[in-house]
Amino acid sequence: MDLPGPIHDFILVFLGLVLILGGLAVVLLPNPIYSAFSLGLVLVCISLLYILSNSHFLAAAQLLIYVGAINVLIIFAVMFLNGSEYYKDLNPWTVGDGVTSVVCTSLFASLITTIPDTSWYGIIWTTKSNQIIEQDLINNSQEIGIHLSTDFLIPFELISIILLVALIGAIAVARQ
């Protein structure tokens, strides 16, 4: 998106604040419906960040896949759960909660140690549409596929494992 510098920076900071507040709302709101709608807000803001950085294909994929399909599915599943039956068997602390907190704490610690060591000056940000090298959608899609299978193989596999665990959890909740 071709925006002047101060407007671009203001929109970037505003979207960042909405992302942080929306993420906190997803985790902290007691009503699962409100959390699901907050997740939709976060996913839309991520799509707007993609538009701001001239990644229109990723923005469209984000809106169609995550907001249009996954978030609607989450809201649909939450609306069919009976809250009184779900919360009466809930233990305050389980072994899975301990394992999850250890994994999340270790991921947080690794991010905190990795982010300051990253050379952010080597990253080239495209803020103008005339700086995009490839205009052909097929070439851009092929480049995304090549990067997913080479440079971003480990994060791609981690996301697939997270989606598999979420699917198993959804099946376990549906069986109860």
Swiss-Prot record:
Keyword Transport: yes
Enzyme Commission identifier(s): 7.1.1.-
Record has ATP-binding as a keyword: no
Top EC class, one word: translocase
GO molecular function: NADH dehydrogenase (ubiquinone) activity; quinone binding
Topology of the protein relative to the lipid bilayer: Multi-pass membrane protein
Main location: plastid
Top-level taxon of origin: Eukaryota
The protein's role, per its UniProt record: NDH shuttles electrons from NAD(P)H:plastoquinone, via FMN and iron-sulfur (Fe-S) centers, to quinones in the photosynthetic chain and possibly in a chloroplast respiratory chain. The immediate electron acceptor for the enzyme in this species is believed to be plastoquinone. Couples the redox reaction to proton translocation, and thus conserves the redox energy in a proton gradient.
Similarity comment: Belongs to the complex I subunit 6 family.
Protein name listed in UniProt: NAD(P)H-quinone oxidoreductase subunit 6, chloroplastic
Organism from which the protein derives: Trachelium caeruleum (Blue throatwort)
